[in-house]
Amino acid sequence: MNLIENKIFDSERALYNIVDTRVKGCTFAGEADGESVLKETRDVLIEDCSFSLRYPIWHAKKYELKNSKLDEKTRAALWYSDDGIIENTEIKGVKALRECRNTIVRNCDIDSPEFGWKTDNTTITDSTIVSEYIFLDAKNIEIDHLDFKGKYSFQYVDGLVIKNSDLDTKDAFWHSKNVTVTDSVVKGEYLAWFSEGLTLIRCKIIGTQPLCYCKDLKLIDCEMQDCDLSFEYSDVQADVKGHIDSVKNPKSGSITADSIGELIYEDSIMECRAEVKTRSQTDK
């Protein structure tokens, strides 16, 4: 493997199309403000580097990005790249990952609006992410131990598994398909409207008007805090521990909780015939 070490690059396409190369301790910044410094690379290991230029890693194949920093000026850092590992790296630029395939993210700190759009086969573990519109229209995502904050998350995704995570969000999972969330906290209003095939297992759900207009919705051993006007027009099978503030116009299926503050049937635009019961009724 070739070695490029302790250099400073600021020109356009400075390391364009390098192959089988280790790039170590380099700085990508300067007056020339060049774009696309590592475009079209193959089999490249990038470690202990800092970036302050736009569009650095586009159309890369079989790359590793480790122990590096990409600041706010590093816009759209990784686009159209395949088979990548991003590890122990800080990413701060907008639109950091887009239309990439087969990406592994480990132990990273990411603050990037519009992160992960239209990606396929992404794995994230032990990371912190702040992002508006994360993973829009992405597919085949696996997440474990993620601390996430941001609005409009995981909309239009297809094929998502989340475990052991804390999601502080709003309008999450809208129009999503085939999503499973396990042992996680999901906080935020208007959760998962218009979703299909969403399963929540041992989760804590916090926020107003969750889980409306859903198809094939399942809640297994979940808690619901500050959840009013829940399940409107949803096809749902829900087993909830504790209290639900209110349930409104559930379309079909079954909802069971320890207690329900209010069951509302009014102003319905369709037949709503879901079975709603408390645990005491079930035990009789």
Predicted regions and their residues:
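Long, distal/terminal scaffolding or interaction modules
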Residues: M1-K284
